[in-house]
């Protein structure tokens, strides 16, 4: 949760923002952090994936002039760190800290350098400006809004803004908002978005296979245990098979060291006897994952719908 262009008392706003963040604490139960000054407030609820020990947010630069709150993962953070190791002093092992380094070097012109899924808010205290951005296709959710005092808000879930903002919008994927420009700008554009540009493209199966493997492999970056949700369908089966292929080694060391959790765990959820569960078990047996089947009854499913609806509103 973030608030910018503050016009109300910062300490009163701080309490309000903490209550807003509490509404979405289920998104990040591992750490709660807040930054507050007279112009901006950033509150973060963290789910630890990379660098659980020192990656608490909001992240700050060494001079504490740049403050960053990120929801997401930056898959090419090791490459960026290596490129900038002589230009920026990193304080944590967090994959997201590279955003601070890139901003310090390039200003707002760095979004194309990032390979990942993300929604972030970066406040530049020295220049009293801020940058909000969202990943190319909107994997990570983000909303924005304004209250009656024209204060600008962002949040990972709509319910954090409900009752506070009198105007709320979805922050569009592939866009950024820079406070000095005061309008949304599209930063992600590709020629293949127009059919005319790709209608005659030949498909290279080997190239497609390599791209898919690389996409799955880079997302195995983790300092905590992970698993795959396996339905037995084509998509989840292919992704699970690729994940199993690389699960025994640590991606972070370019497969040079053994993974901390070398066995891939797969999970399937459904009604007992459902055909999806049977298919998932067949795939799990074939690829050799440690498989977990979780069953629920129709009544349990109906009961869960009420609980989920209430959680969305709370």
Residue ranges and their predicted role:
Residues 2, 7, 15-20, 26, ...:
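N-terminal segments that mediate ammonia production and transfer
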Residues 5-15, 86, 125-131, 136-142, ...:
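ATP-dependent adenylate-handling active sites, centered on carboxylate activation for C-N bond formation
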Residues 85, 104-108:
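Glycine-centered helix-coil hinge/cap
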Residues 95-96, 115-117, 277:
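Conserved glycosyltransferase catalytic-site signature
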């Amino acid at each position: 949760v973030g608030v910018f262009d503050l016009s109300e008392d910062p300490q009163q706003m701080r309490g309000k923002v903490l209550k807003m963040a509490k509404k979405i604490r289920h998104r990040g139960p591992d750490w709660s952090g807040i930054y507050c000054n007279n112009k901006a407030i950033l509150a973060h609820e963290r789910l630890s994936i990379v660098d659980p020990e020192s990656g608490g947010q909001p992240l700050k630069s060494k001079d504490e002039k740049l403050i960053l709150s990120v929801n997401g993962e930056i898959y090419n953070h090791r490459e960026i760190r290596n490129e900038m190791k002589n230009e920026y002093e990193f304080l944590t092992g967090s994959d997201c800290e590279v955003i601070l380094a890139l901003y310090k070097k390039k200003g707002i012109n760095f979004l194309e350098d990032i390979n990942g899924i993300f929604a972030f808010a970066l406040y530049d205290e020295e220049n009293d400006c801020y940058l909000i951005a969202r990943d190319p296709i909107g994997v990570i959710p983000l909303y924005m809004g304004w209250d009656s005092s024209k204060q600008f808000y962002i949040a990972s879930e709509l319910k954090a803004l409900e009752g506070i903002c009198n105007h709320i919008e979805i922050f569009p994927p592939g866009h950024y908002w820079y406070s000095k420009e005061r309008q949304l700008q599209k930063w992600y554009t590709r020629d293949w978005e127009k059919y005319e540009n790709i209608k005659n493209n030949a498909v290279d199966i080997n190239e497609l296979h390599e791209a898919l493997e690389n996409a799955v492999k880079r997302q195995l970056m983790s300092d905590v245990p992970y698993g795959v949700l396996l339905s037995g369908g084509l998509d989840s089966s292919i992704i699970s098979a690729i994940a199993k292929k690389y699960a025994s080694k640590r991606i972070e060391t370019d497969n040079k060291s053994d993974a901390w959790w070398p066995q891939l765990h797969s999970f399937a959820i459904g009604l007992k006897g459902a055909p999806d569960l049977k298919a998932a078990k067949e795939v799990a047996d074939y690829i050799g994952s440690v498989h977990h089947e979780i069953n629920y009854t129709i009544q349990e499913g109906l009961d869960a719908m009420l609980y989920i609806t209430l959680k969305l509103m709370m």
